[in-house]
């Protein structure tokens, strides 16, 4: 027997059997070879590969994607192999791939880079080859054609161009096309100006959340919002300002996951003529040394006060 075929059968026969349960995923064939390496491979598997989201096929020996180091802002992702599954506790023991073991916290790992994780937190990619993703994309994009013949022709054209890397769709298309999920194919959305009212801000926030939940990034401009301390006549109060309202919208970024480790992306803007512009700029500063420099060297009392507020802020 051909040694290549023996290796193929040993490596992917089970996965192809699992794939039969997922009508949108194409099986691995012997002519597929594009897998990428390092970060490129992790991004492909984590963000674009079709997953068994219900874990119905998860078993020993499977390749999975997991968070190897927990962090509220910058969690480290990696790949690993399932060693055993505890159905009672809904956990799995995983040997983390060698290239990601350096990210693991020492207190979480056993000898040999073995970790225990809840099954719920694992992702099992079904598309290990770029050609599988290209086939799914081509099939999905060709569905708009009106006859079977035209659909087949479009499928072949899309697939050959994408496989040859002559045409690479945007990330949201790689993730969504042909997947049967109701996600967006657009990476970025530019929103209308935010209406200067509680109802208008709430509606804007709702739209941002909906776009992000379907995979899109959002740009919002808060220049239409009234400045900080402005009188709100209807309730005889004062506004907390454009920065506070836009910060609330920006926090959606940390709440909405978009598949794998990808979180929603936003660009929050404010015009340079807006009275809150200094507060806006300082709110984006992360380096304490810069804030201290501003406090110690700037003469403008408003700017110094804003820098002090930012430096001493504790969420």
Where are these regions (language model features)?
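Extended catalytic cores of very large enzyme megasubunits
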Residues: 1-315
